[in-house]
Amino acid sequence: MTKPQQQSPPSTTATTTTSPPPPPPSTPPPASSSSSSLAKLPLRLHSLASSSRSLLSALRRSPVTTLVAAFFLLALFMYGEDVRTLAELSIDDYLYPDADFYNVSALPPLLLPPPTCDLSRGRWVFDNTSLPAYREKECTFLTKQVSCLANGRPDDLWQYWRWQPNNCSLPTFDARRFMEKMRGKRMMFVGDSLNRNQWESLVCLVQPILSKGRKKIVKRGSFNIFYAKEYRATLEFYWAPFLVESNSDNPNFHHIDQRIISPERIESHANNWKDVDYLIFNTYIWWMNNEDIKVRRPNSTSWSDHDEVPRIETYGRVFKTWSTWLEQNVDPARTSVFFMTISPLHNSPAQWGNPNGIKCVKETLPVLNYTKPLDLNHDMRMYDLVAKVAKNMKNVPVSLIDITRMSDYRKDAHTSLYSIRQGKLLTPEQKADPQKYADCIHWCLPGVPDVWNQILYTRILSKSSPPSPHPPLPPQ
């Protein structure tokens, strides 16, 4: 890791402005070709590579051989294969070895916090020695939406704050330890753009240890899939902002005036969640436009045929559908399920003692001098409902990762005016209207979602022992 440039700690005068106190082993990610065709792909690519070597030497001997060879190679490329799939999986994926197994047992023991330690309670500590975990310009997989420095943000202090739990320490994210745990497995973030924000963070945390040309992102429908080819592992994001079916399920075109959901219909999404080793869910921000939610009537043929139902009632129906699906379709011996709690909005500066501010604009420091939690007007009924559902799961444990309070204090870390709208950077005219255009929902990277992943990493490694030195490779 490149040693970060030393940053000066924030001055005490500044703080007074704050308020007091590879593809999976069994089934690859969905593709446009059939699963049987995909299963045969590695064998065909191996045959293609072997045949190519033989044919290349024959090309020099006869024009007829050359013509036959050309037709043969064309047939190998076209027969029974989807062009997109061939483009995504190159021949060298099957000619070069996997990453060497990382000898985790040779490392110092990983000091994990005790189960009794509440990782969600603590404080933010300025740390310009070990942070940031990566540099924005060094992670080429970052989207423009969260690349705040590249988008013109003039300060970078938000990157240098480490989360310190009150009664224990949080292990530093070790990408090699994590990827050994992920070898031959799938991890999938399911939800809205905040879960995508966290997925991007995780990709940036692991990508430095992966060889050039052996890592890539493929976007297909509702999926963004990061392939760590040396580990035959995938880190995936799946767009489902309400978890259940809605009229906002198109991952590219979902800016809809009237959001309508089907609380009892989940299969079109959930069928894509099967055979995944780690499932990380979220859903909150898309519920917050109105107190009542538009709900499609049962057996209706149009989204326009709907009723308005109180938000908390609809949320409860969705989580009944979601939890039932998990109980009936997830094998807890294979799959670990996590749920990320509320990620806050910072739209009301008076809530942190800055009544003259405009949303999160020009905030450069966390809330530091606090003695009690901030009140940011979260709908805590929704938080409590998810916690109750998780507690009452019978066969499939759901682990809540509480990111809410720690993130509440980070008014400084949002993308604010240094983001994009409809694929374009904000214009000077838009920046002049921060009340309308400042994004105080999403987070700059590197930043707060790195800590969320640090906690996820800790929870995953706390649940099991180190992997065997020589586990079998997943079938190709």
From Swiss-Prot:
S-S bridge residues: C117-C168, C139-C204, C148-C444, C360-C440
EC code(s) of this entry: 2.3.1.-
Topology within the bilayer: Single-pass type II membrane protein
GO terms under cellular component: Golgi apparatus; Golgi membrane
Lumenal side: 81-476
Biased composition (Pro residues): 19-31
Organism name: Oryza sativa subsp. japonica
Family, per entry: Belongs to the PC-esterase family. TBL subfamily.
Name of the encoding gene: XOAT4
Pfam families for the chain: PC-Esterase (PF13839), PMR5N (PF14416)
Motif DXXH motif, residue range(s) on this chain: 439-442
Extent of Low complexity compositional bias: 8-18
GO biological process: xylan acetylation
Active site: S193, D439, H442
Protein's name according to its UniProt entry: Xylan O-acetyltransferase 4
